[in-house]
Amino acid sequence: LEDQFYLGLYYSTLTSSPENYNQNKFSSTLNFGFIRDFPFNEQRNFGVGVGVGLSLSSSNSNLKLSDLNSSVSGEIVNSEDFTKNKWNTTKIEFPFEVRWRTSTPTNYKFWRVYFGVKTSYLLKSKYKYESLNSNYTLENLPFRKTQSGITVNAGNNTWNLGLYMGLNP
């Protein structure tokens, strides 16, 4: 196994969303960090990885957020009524993975499969709305501070395909 720096770009989508909710433009997550390997066998091809990283997410949709008496509410609006409607989050993340690969001490082109759990802590959140009639920004949105999800990564050589499914609504 090997320690690794990681860099990932994910397409973000909601699996449970309000009626008439639509994502528009490209909603994405960029994450990067470091994972330390702890091998379980002499071949060093099975073990666990523990790490720390940073996650930057941007979500574009027709869900308009408003601040009403220090309480944030949301409503579905027509996508043609605004020019910008997105929220951004910054999180510190802590991945834990069970790791298996076909590597040998001399072969660096190998298959890999990693299953794991990622826990993250929300550091910052920001919402921006722009239309012909209204422009405003909200910060420190009432999102859950601690979030967890299941991860699956599989790949060959230097490329991986990764999936993340959040466990918290």
Language-model-derived ranges and their functions:
Residues 18-25, 59-69, 74-89, 122-132, ...:
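Extracellular/periplasm-exposed beta-strand and loop segments of Gram-negative cell-envelope proteins
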Residues 1-8, 12:
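N-terminal targeting leaders of membrane proteins
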